[in-house]
UniProtKB/Swiss-Prot annotation:
Record organism: Pyrococcus horikoshii (strain ATCC 700860 / DSM 12428 / JCM 9974 / NBRC 100139 / OT-3)
Record-stated family: Belongs to the ACC deaminase/D-cysteine desulfhydrase family.
Keywords: Hydrolase, Pyridoxal phosphate
Highest taxon above the source species: Archaea
Record flagged with keyword Plastid: no
One Pfam family hit: PALP
EC top class, as a word: hydrolase
Name of the protein in question: Putative 1-aminocyclopropane-1-carboxylate deaminase
Entry annotated with the keyword Transmembrane helix: no
SUPFAM superfamilies tied to this protein: Tryptophan synthase beta subunit-like PLP-dependent enzymes
UniProt GO MF annotations: 1-aminocyclopropane-1-carboxylate deaminase activity; D-cysteine desulfhydrase activity
Length: 325
């Protein structure tokens, strides 16, 4: 852990959910194919439940919840949400109750199946997006307060200034873990918290590394504004200035959760060439974007990809994926 980042983060409550540094691997076969050195930070191996990037955010979010005396955690997401499942699981591990406020078709597959197996309370609504779900979450929180409970509401994907600190910490880990001088760090951008944290961490260390986000869903002014606000608010928490701005590229194929032949093929290629499994919603799209941009020479010679996890999402989209291969 880089001492500068360690010192900045020391004042924030944190629960340790990740007992190790996640490894950085070189991808020799993919690198030869695209003409750039590609490395992967295995944040799919963060250790709790199905792993993934959300665990880093939850270390600070649940640390904050416990410091405020919370006894129940509420969060939102799609029925197959990685974030919702690992939030519920982490809360239970820490002795907290959890309520997952979800939208979508109730099928016993993927993360929704895991929610049920683990006995995590779920409430499914006919909502158009996570913003609408947050209204339901706040209503539930108010109801619990009237009952004398102490709820703590976590936004979609854990994308909040506190959650962003998890990937500021990740930059500190990368800085002392690898001797490679990366030109760019590439990550899937959904709710934006991971990309915001990477950008802020690179600013703090004054690293000449480009943070690159591959948008996997809603793209445009709303997303860029949200990302800017996350970075600004997290920087204010830490008392630092922002020097590095992220770059965003749209590889959503039109909408969140839309699976295409390109995504299916890149999942198969990375799996069979490197032995690493990507998911169709986040990392599959993001890695496809990486390959496309790298072939155009837009990411430099040495690229680090953050594997944000999400393997269980593959099973939710199984029939669709197979039909495209």
């Amino acid at each position: 852990m880089h001492p500068k980042i360690f010192a900045l983060l020391a004042k924030f409550p944190r629960v340790e959910l990740i007992p190790w540094e996640t490894p950085i691997q070189y991808l020799p076969n993919i690198s030869r194919e695209i003409g750039a050195d590609v490395y992967i930070k295995r944040d799919d191996l963060t250790g709790l439940g199905i792993g993934g990037n959300k665990i880093r955010k939850l270390e600070y979010l649940l640390g904050d919840a416990l410091s405020k005396g919370a006894d129940v955690v509420i969060t939102v997401g799609a029925v197959h949400s990685n974030h919702a499942f690992v939030t519920g699981l982490a809360a239970k591990k820490l002795g907290l109750d959890a309520i997952l406020v979800l939208r979508g078709k109730e099928e016993l597959k993927g993360n929704y199946l895991l929610d049920k197996i683990m006995g995590i309370e779920t409430r499914v609504y006919d909502a158009k997006d996570s913003f609408e779900l947050m209204k339901y979450a706040e209503e539930i929180a108010e109801e619990l307060k009237r009952e004398g409970r102490k709820p703590y509401v976590i936004p979609p994907g854990g994308a909040s200034p506190i959650g962003t600190l998890g990937y500021v910490r990740a930059v500190g880990e990368i800085a002392t873990q690898s001797e490679v001088k990366f030109d760019s760090i590439v990550v899937a951008a959904g709710s934006g918290g991971t990309l915001a944290g990477l950008s802020l961490g690179l600013s703090i260390l004054n690293e000449d590394i480009r943070p690159v986000g591959i948008a996997v869903g809603r793209f445009g002014e709303v997303m860029t504004s949200k990302l800017d606000n996350l970075i600004k608010e997290a920087a204010e928490l830490l008392g630092v200035k922002v020097e590095v701005r992220p770059e965003l590229y749209d590889y959503s194929f039109g909408e969140y959760g839309k699976i295409t032949g390109e995504v299916a093929q890149i999942i198969r290629k990375v799996g069979t060439r490197e032995g690493i499994i990507l998911d169709p919603v986040y990392t599959g799209k993001a890695f496809y974007g990486l390959v496309d941009l790298a072939r155009k020479g837009e990411l430099g010679e040495k690229i680090l990809f953050i594997h944000t996890g999400g393997i269980s999402g593959t099973f939710h989209y199984g029939d669709k994926l197979l039909s495209l291969l």
